[in-house]
């Protein structure tokens, strides 16, 4: 039996760099043949113009996302969770909560930042402190 891995990724739509990388991971035959893999879309934005904006609809999507992640990890008990969070802005804090919940539940978590936001936010003490968590 192969290892269970849960991938929590940004997937299109909307189409942007991190979402395309997530799609490549989701569709990888090598990953699929090597692991018992599951994917969850981390995105709460429905379009490019929705990125960076706050709305009740996105808040509701986020609450439903947290509930979905909880149920999936409880049902499949993955040996590893691979997540591609945002590296800055409000979305960083949204994704940070997901990572912390998974860690509190006892799961091994690999955090992979795809964008260049880490260098832009690393000089800010709050982000720098949270990056190390």
Model regions and ranges:
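Short low-complexity, flexible loop/linker segments enriched in glycine and/or proline
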Residues: 54, 124-127
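N-terminal beta-loop-helix "entrance" segment that forms/cooperates
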Residues: 43-61
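Conserved strand-to-helix beginnings and helix N-cap segments that scaffold or border functional pockets
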Residues: 18-19, 92-96, 123-124
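Glycine-rich, highly charged phosphate/nucleotide-binding loops
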Residues: 56-73
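Structural recognition of alpha->loop->beta junctions
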Residues: 127-133
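An aromatic- and histidine-rich active-site surface loop
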Residues: 65, 80-105
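N-terminal subdomain of nucleotide-sugar transferases
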Residues: 1-45, 76, 106-107
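A short, histidine- and acid-enriched strand-loop-helix "catalytic/donor-clamping" loop
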Residues: 86-91, 105-125
């Amino acid at each position: 039996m192969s290892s269970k891995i849960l991938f929590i990724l940004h997937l299109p739509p909307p189409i942007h760099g991190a979402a395309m990388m997530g799609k490549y991971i989701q569709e990888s035959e090598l990953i699929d043949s090597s692991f018992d893999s599951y994917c969850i879309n981390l995105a709460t934005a429905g379009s490019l113009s929705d990125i960076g904006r706050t709305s009740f609809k996105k808040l509701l999507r986020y609450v439903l996302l947290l509930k979905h992640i909880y149920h999936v990890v409880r049902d499949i008990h993955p040996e590893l969770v691979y997540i591609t969070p945002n590296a800055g802005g409000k979305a960083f804090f949204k994704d940070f909560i997901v990572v912390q919940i998974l860690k509190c539940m006892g799961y091994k978590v690999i955090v992979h930042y795809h964008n260049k936001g880490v260098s832009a936010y690393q000089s800010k003490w709050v982000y720098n402190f949270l990056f190390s968590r």
